[in-house]
């Protein structure tokens, strides 16, 4: 269920540059101003981030596990790597020294643990890598002014995505999949712009019970760049998990300003 729900968020918010559309001069001005409000990790020269993932095994769904199984999981190694496009790769490994009677159970739980990392960070690029507004104008179908602020209609094959902002371009709501997926993002101020620090998503699928996911991100500064440091993710009603990113290594390239 976890992977299925996060895949809905990923699929509903993959922008494409193939559907050409020219913004009007007024729309382009709005788009440029909106982008400037958000911290752009990509523009800072980000190349990659590699971290170990350390889980709080006293958080759900791990807290009720037998102590022997929790001990086995504490020996597992999970790593997260985010590349220069913001795309994550999660690797996981259990030591072969774990007793056979707990190895299969530990493997099953490790899959759950890694899915909580994959799910969050597969949805992260379109909100946290360069902000919620796509970097290219042809990824935006139209921009409308509303009494509350603005609505950005994105070019997404099969399922339009609408991003609503206030008059200061702070995102207040994202709707997708024909209005069946509703997201409310959290952006926190910094001296480099608004930084993505959380998301609440509700999926109301036909003939299925609604699924609600919330996650909050702690951040850290590495080599002058603001990147994730930890996650608190809840999937109602039975997951309330926490993990931190440790031993992080970051690579960056020189940014050349073209005048």
Region locations from a protein language model:
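Gly/Pro-enriched, hydrophobic low-complexity segments
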Residues: 149-259
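An acidic-aromatic
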Residues: 74-132, 155, 160-162, 177-178
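Bacterial N-terminal signal peptides that target proteins for export
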Residues: 1-9
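Flexible, membrane-facing loop/turn or short amphipathic-helix motifs
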Residues: 59-68, 202-208
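Bacterial N-terminal signal peptides
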Residues: 8-17
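Short, exposed beta-strand/loop patches in secreted or surface proteins that constitute
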Residues: 42, 70-71, 78-81, 136-145, ...
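N-terminal leader/targeting segments and the immediate start of mature chains
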Residues: 17-59
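A short, amphipathic edge element
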Residues: 33, 129-140, 179-182, 209-212
